[in-house]
């Protein structure tokens, strides 16, 4: 979403790399120093489930980010392997790795804010999943349209963000991961809204419309409307029928409307759903 990505080769190591050219809103003013500070912090982050930012190059008022190169993302993988959703153990392995990457970032006080299957990259050799674009939202903002003028998807956006909260935090990423979890199992997006209001309605139709009892403070959020239809919550088991009881319990905890009640990434990793997982 932030600019063009080139596949390139590091002539010193002969490795393939992804070169992301950042498109800045104020082209003439060069790169804001705050953005450079933010991005420099990301170079310190090293985790097997995060795409490694190898270098930051600042040339002629442009910023180039050098990442390790991975050509497969979770969306492409789900589109090309419809049988993936049947492999619930693989879904669990992927979810565990996604949560490990998110928990690591959150422990360093870095949010993603725009997690979606397209920025979860897969290393085909090891079946490792890695989060791309972590921390870029804070440095550059979330664009409304991508570089190719596609509208940035709202399908994974947390309800507090959609309702205009200015004080959101790490729970926004856990919501996104919950949506991705359901999509891996169902082979289709959970809340495919085509506008902010449609997105909220799609969420409320399944999770239920929030009120002050369910989510204290919700009615004071800038974009909350007392005219929202009052939908009752549905049973998640009817929405994600192929997921067992422990998986549904975890999904339910990740999709709590009230961000203060949503499970953390770290706590999610301790959930019973993962008890049969052995990761190095």
UniProtKB/Swiss-Prot annotation:
It catalyses: L-seryl-[protein] + ATP = O-phospho-L-seryl-[protein] + ADP + H(+); L-threonyl-[protein] + ATP = O-phospho-L-threonyl-[protein] + ADP + H(+); [DNA-directed RNA polymerase] + ATP = phospho-[DNA-directed RNA polymerase] + ADP + H(+). The keyword Ligase does not apply. ATP binds at residues 1-5, 20. CDD domains: STKc_CDK1_CdkB_like. It comes from the Eukaryota. Its EC number is 2.7.11.22, 2.7.11.23. GO terms for molecular function: ATP binding; cyclin binding; cyclin-dependent protein serine/threonine kinase activity; protein serine kinase activity; RNA polymerase II CTD heptapeptide repeat kinase activity. This is Cell division control protein 2 homolog B. It comes from Antirrhinum majus (Garden snapdragon).
């Amino acid at each position: 979403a932030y600019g063009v990505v080139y596949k390139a080769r590091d002539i010193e190591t002969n490795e393939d790399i992804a070169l992301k050219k950042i498109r800045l809103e104020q082209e003439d003013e060069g790169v804001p120093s705050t953005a450079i500070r933010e991005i420099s912090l990301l170079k310190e982050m090293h985790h097997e489930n995060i795409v490694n930012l190898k270098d930051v190059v600042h040339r002629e008022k442009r910023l180039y980010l050098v990442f390790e190169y991975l050509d497969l993302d979770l969306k492409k993988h789900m589109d090309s392997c419809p049988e993936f959703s049947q492999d619930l153990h693989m879904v669990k392995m992927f979810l565990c790795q996604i949560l490990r990457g998110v928990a690591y970032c959150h422990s360093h006080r870095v949010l993603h804010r725009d997690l979606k299957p397209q920025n979860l990259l897969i290393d085909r050799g090891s079946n490792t999943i890695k989060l791309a674009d972590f921390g870029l939202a804070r440095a550059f903002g979330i664009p409304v349209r991508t570089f190719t003028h596609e509208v940035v998807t709202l399908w994974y956006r947390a309800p507090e963000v959609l309702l205009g909260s200015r004080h959101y935090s790490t729970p926004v990423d856990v919501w996104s991961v919950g949506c991705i979890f359901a999509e891996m199992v169902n082979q289709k997006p959970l809340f495919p809204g085509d506008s902010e209001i449609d997105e909220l309605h799609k969420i409320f139709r399944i999770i239920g419309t929030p009120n002050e009892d369910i989510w204290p403070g919700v009615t004071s959020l800038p974009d909350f409307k007392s005219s929202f239809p009052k939908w009752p919550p549905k049973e998640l088991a009817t929405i994600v029928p192929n997921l067992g009881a422990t998986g549904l319990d975890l999904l339910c905890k990740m999709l709590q409307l009230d961000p203060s009640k949503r499970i953390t990434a770290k706590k999610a990793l301790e959930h019973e759903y993962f008890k049969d997982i052995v990761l190095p």
